[in-house]
Swiss-Prot record:
The keyword Transmembrane belongs to this UniProt entry's keyword annotation: no
Protein name listed in UniProt: Polyribonucleotide nucleotidyltransferase
Region of interest (Disordered), residue spans: 699-721
Organism: Anaeromyxobacter dehalogenans (strain 2CP-C)
S1 motif domain ranges (all copies): 631-699
Known catalytic reactions: RNA(n+1) + phosphate = RNA(n) + a ribonucleoside 5'-diphosphate
A GO cellular-component term linked to this record: cytosol
CDD domains registered for this protein in UniProt: KH-I_PNPase (cd02393), RNase_PH_PNPase_1 (cd11363), RNase_PH_PNPase_2 (cd11364), S1_PNPase (cd04472)
């Protein structure tokens, strides 16, 4: 196959799509290039459907090869290891964007692999993977309803930029990744520095317009590869008569069940209705072996029709009756309770409860040694703020093995972390490494938003001087023709059966984090404006409830948290603190029980829960790094006697020479007539040459001391007064 190339211009830069050059045995293979960043994306789908499942078995893997940036992995085996957080989050971005677009009922295992094979340190590769995934699927025979395309939108200096460079992103106050089709925004993920709802909407619409050339390029690429027909598959069965019977047997019962407020009570009743449905159908067919056998064979189909009844009823209840599960109105938020400081030995803690969703959140303050070190294409990255989200099985009344965090947990944690990072104090004002852990105690929707609220309270309880409190809310959408309902603080059912999951986090002043997944086309600007406006009102209500527990950061950190003091020394004196083989710094930390971190610029951070120990360590460091000052008088110790003078240590590690002529104002025949080794002596620094050699004078020190009738002898190693 001859390689085929198509190009599109996005944000003034050319994006290249190429197929037919590599990975030709994949069902779809596209090479995406922006600048010198290149991502290879492949799509493959199994020939046969996977039996016994009720979901689409799609796997998306995004991987960054360190050779792409000319780097060798730092692991023991010098190979890439488990996926990084960036790889996991990008895999989720692609999955969330593409999954809703596959044909309903298609159940063949499908895998999309995006591999970064070149990185130019300017153009990020996540949006290339997103566009490449759509293109690879679009040119294949896999039943995919694309194309879509990905773009990053940033606001730099008040101007919106499509696919900004890494340098531009560093100066941006808004940074979102989004996927869009011809007529709809499909997915949004990003953060901001308290921007307004109007700015966010403009950014999203700007991004949707920016991807249109990429959609044209994908269509052109598909046409150039022969418009391969989509493969045939068995669509979902639709027995109109059986569907009507299922509805007749369950509609009123489902109506009663959805009137129950408590989640497990409601779920239990809905499960009972399903059993009653199957039993009723079997009783109706009693005595007819063929019909009974048919019911057994079609049980999965019958359950599917029952799920449709639940779907139809809940949506009708919302759009027609303007009533939600539990009787709430469209903008109503569940009851909120907040508690802080409930874990006595933890640096900061909170318990945030909203309806049947609850998060127990703890904050830990650490030192520079606790920073997370992450190897990325851009180099080694150090994270001083982390938020980890955990979703144990008991939170939803289930029994499962406890395993390491999955993609969902990592994604929810990243969303909450981004929401709070925007209000964290700068490092020079608060030099701590901060770890927030959110453990979900119970869940019925919006647990990630509970983590944001609980995380904020926990940070304030820990005394972290955040700029402003942050809250999060999950919004939903039900759209039936012209009937539209926008829901605040959605439940799990409303998320599952709705058309949009829109999470918005921020302060009273503006948005700090956003995540949106839309399952339908045609979400208009008006819908986005109403959703964001309703979210802002809900956010302010939640902030008010949080303020009842704690309205501002505590004035001091926990007694159990380390106290960190930072001092500055000359960089060339760093070696004096470290000592040969680290001997000196190890001695200081052992004697004081402190943790010491030294930066290349001479910043020295000393940490300990005991402030007295911090001061002790600072005194020792000052003693090692202080500089001799010309004209100052010191008490020193004679370390060596020579014919021409004496070497005196004026403070630890620093010696100077008293020439024999500077011992006394009288003639001295022998140095040993005046001084002896180990003797303490008052000396004055009379010069320091370019090489750092110090000249001392005993006679000038004595003369100066005699002139000061109120003078006192200075302590050893310190200037005289």
């Amino acid at each position: 196959m001859t390689p085929i190339q198509k190009t599109a211009t996005v944000g003034g830069k050319e994006v290249l799509l190429e197929t037919g050059k590599v990975a030709k045995q994949a069902h779809g293979s596209v090479w995406v290039r922006l600048g010198d960043s290149i991502v290879l994306v492949t799509a493959v789908s199994a020939a046969e459907k996977k039996e016994g499942i009720d979901f689409f078995p799609l796997t998306v893997d995004y991987q960054e090869k360190l050779f792409a940036a000319g780097r060798v992995p730092g692991s023991f085996f010098r190979r890439e290891g488990r996926p990084t957080e960036k790889e996991t989050l990008t895999s989720r971005l692609v999955d969330r964007s593409c999954r809703p677009l596959f044909a309903e009922g298609y159940s063949n295992e499908t895998q999309v692999i995006a591999t970064v094979i070149s990185f130019d340190q300017e153009n990020d590769t996540d949006v290339l993977a997103l566009t490449g995934a759509s293109a690879a699927l679009h040119i294949s025979d896999i039943p995919f309803g694309g194309p879509i395309a990905g773009v990053r939108v940033a606001r730099v200096g008040g101007q919106l930029v499509a696919n900004p460079t890494l340098a531009q992103r560093a100066d941006a106050d808004l940074d979102v990744v989004m996927a869009a089709s011809r007529d709809a925004i499909v997915m949004v993920e990003g953060g901001a520095q308290e921007v307004s709802e109007a700015v966010m909407i403009e950014a999203l619409l700007f991004g949707q317009a920016a991807v249109q050339p990429l959609l044209d390029a994908q269509d052109a690429l598909r046409a150039a590869t022969g418009n391969k027909p989509r493969r045939a598959f068995d669509p979902p069965k639709n027995d109109v008569e059986l569907r009507a019977k299922v509805k007749a047997l369950t509609w009123e019962k489902v109506k009663e069940a959805y009137g129950r407020d408590e989640k497990h009570d409601r779920y239990g009743r809905l499960s009972e209705i399903k059993k009653e449905l199957l039993q009723a159908l079997k009783e109706e067919a009693a005595g007819d072996a063929a019909k009974l056998a048919t019911i057994a064979l079609r049980e999965k189909e019958i359950k599917g029709y029952y799920e449709d009844v639940k779907y139809d009823y809940m949506r009708k209840m919302i759009t027609d009756e303007r009533r939600r599960i539990g009787g709430r109105g469209m903008a109503d938020i569940r009851k909120i309770t907040c508690e802080v400081g409930l874990l006595p030995r933890v640096h900061g803690s909170s318990l945030f409860t909203r309806g049947e969703t609850q998060a127990l959140v703890a904050t830990t303050l650490g030192t520079a040694e606790d920073e997370q070190r992450v190897e990325m294409l851009t180099g080694m990255v150090f994270k001083k703020f982390m938020l980890h989200y955990n979703f144990p099985p008991f939170s939803v009344g289930e029994v499962k093995f406890l395993r390491s965090p999955g993609r969902r947990e990592i994604g929810h944690g990243a969303l909450a972390e981004r929401a709070l990072r925007a209000v964290m104090p700068p490092e020079d004002q608060f030099p701590y490494t901060v770890r927030v852990v959110s453990d979900i105690m119970e869940s019925n929707g919006s647990s990630s938003m509970a983590s944001v609220c609980g995380g904020c309270l926990s940070l304030m309880d820990a005394g972290v001087p955040i700029k402003a409190p942050v809250a999060g809310i999950a919004m939903g959408l039900i759209k039936e023709g012209e009937k539209i309902a926008i829901l605040s603080d959605i439940l799990g059912d409303e998320d599952h059966l709705g058309d949009m999951d829109f999470k918005v986090c921020g302060t009273a002043a503006g948005i700090t984090s956003i995540q949106m997944d839309i399952k339908i086309g045609g979400v208009t600007r008006e819908i986005l404006e109403q959703a964001l406006s309703q979210a802002a009102e809900g956010r302010k209500h939640i902030l008010g409830e949080m303020a009842k527990a704690l309205s501002a950061p505590r004035g001091s950190i926990s007694a159990y948290a380390p106290r960190i003091t930072t001092i500055k020394i000359r960089p060339e004196r760093i070696k004096d603190i470290i000592g040969p083989g680290g001997k000196t710094i190890k001695d200081i930390t052992a004697r004081t029980g402190t943790s010491i971190n030294i930066e290349d610029d001479g910043s020295v951070s000393i940490a300990s829960p005991n402030q007295d120990k911090v001061e002790e360590a600072i005194k020792m460091i000052r003693g090692l790094t202080q500089e001799a000052e010309v004209g100052r008088i010191y008490m020193g110790t004679v370390r060596k006697i020579a014919e021409f003078g004496a070497f005196v240590e004026i403070f630890p590690g620093t010696d100077g020479l008293i020439h024999i002529s500077e011992l006394s104002d009288k003639r001295v025949k022998s140095v040993s007539d005046v001084l002896s080794e180990g003797e303490e002596v008052m000396v004055k620094v009379i010069s320091v040459d370019r090489s750092g050699k110090i000249r001392l004078s005993r006679k000038e020190a004595l003369a100066d001391s005699a002139k000061k009738s109120e003078g006192t002898e200075p302590p050893k190693g310190e200037p005289a007064k």
